[in-house]
Amino acid sequence: VLMYLESEEDNSINLTEMQKEAVVQSILNGVTVITGGPGTGKTTIILSIIKIFEAMNKKVLLCAPTGRAAKRITESTGREAKTIHRLLEYAYGENDSNLVFNRNENSPLDCHAIIVDEMSMVDILLMNNLLKALKRGTKLIMVGDVDQLPSVGAGNILSDIIKSNTIRTIR
């Protein structure tokens, strides 16, 4: 991974040592959190991760909790990003009152890795459904700023994950 980052193949992106560490950990670990404030290079890290997975012929899915965040990450990476709801193929249940997701443990997402941007805005219900839709072995890379807006729904997932000290977090 480091050799790719430092190769002539990709000299369009200059990463700091901490950004390189975030990229390497994301490629190697099953679950990774990347957190930092505005302007710390989170989007640059995301683009580097995508390029490495693409060089390995691995499919990566990009998503975010809101349409605005998905559009922003699409524009900055040049890769399609969807809202988490759209990625999970949401639909309304029988009586139009409950939301169901067609991507779940019975019909998981087909990818090697999934990158969730603006993770601070993801609530516990959406996170639960996203996790259900991941196949065993799918890498989960969560990116966000813990000091940004928390989710409207229940749960402060990103903050709780970081505080737990159980998942590799790069700041």
Predicted segments with their positions:
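Conserved ATP-binding/catalytic motifs of P-loop helicase motor domains
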Residues: V1-R171
